[in-house]
Amino acid sequence: MGDNKEERKKMKKTRYVALVLLSSLLTLVGCSRREILDDYPVTGINIRLDWEGVTGRLPEGVRVIFYPKDTQGRKIDTYLPAKGGEMKVPPGHYLAVIYNYDTEVVQVKGEDSYETIMACTGNCTGLGDSETENMVWGPDNFYVATLDDVEIGKGEELPTLEVRPKSVVTTYIFSIKTEGLKNVSSIIGSVSGMAECYHLGKGAGLCRFAPIYCETGKGNGVIKGSFTCFGHPELTQARADITQFLNLIIVRVDGSRQEAKVEITEAVKPPKDEPGEGDEKPQESEIEIELPDDEKIVVDDVEVPPDESG
């Protein structure tokens, strides 16, 4: 019995010594790791964002991601005020993206690399009609700046980088002559073949063939509406291989439905850049779709339910 008690004392003492040694070892490792982190060369950069001519209403702030082009640097992801600020970045060569994060429907995904970072919107929900379930929302205001070669040196002086973001969302408005508007109760609209996603690294709108929801209504002898999409026309990829359509589901006053499809491929085709203009050509934030004079929708007559109010 006494031998067991003595043995337990020895084991307890041994465990105590082991714990002390382990604690000392962890302390040494922790100090060493802190020294390594403290010695890791981190300089910085001052980013100034110029919004003049871009928008009169500044976003809440921006997200800035630096992607290393070599083994010297490492990925840096941070948030700055709308007008920019200072951020710590290790020396090296970088690719970088900057965008506003205060969007309502735009979702950024694929942030792991410059080659995959992309902005898209989600599916339409809450509209109360099954016809809208396969549609996606048009994007709200989204501003992007991309930098394909930023060199961060080891000097103590903080360099300043002047950057001007650009809007990558365009609003299109349309008006289609319509006969029989008295038969129309409501309209569900979408556009197909336009860019519902935006590749930040490539600076291009991407079409993944999801119809984009359109705001629609009745005007004076017309069905009118608008939609937004990613990228101005000259930035959208593969436009020559895609046909664009306005798709309208017309709900008539008796509850029946009529579909109308209007091709807008030529109307939304981007103008060719003039020699020497390049990226300096100002982009239009709103474009009116001009349709041929003979383009017209005829809504079939239906029996209008009697007015029971009187």
Residues covered by each model-derived region:
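Bacterial N-terminal signal peptides that target proteins for export
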Residues: 9-18
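C-terminal motif of bacterial Sec signal peptides marking the signal peptidase cleavage site
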Residues: 28-30
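Bacterial signal peptide processing site
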Residues: 32-35
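Structural motif
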Residues: 48-59, 175-183
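Tryptophan-paired
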Residues: 63-112, 185-270
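Short, low-hydrophobicity acidic/polar segments
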Residues: 74-167
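A sequence/structural signal for flexible, mid-protein segments enriched
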Residues: 136-220
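Hydrophilic extracytoplasmic domains
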Residues: 241-310
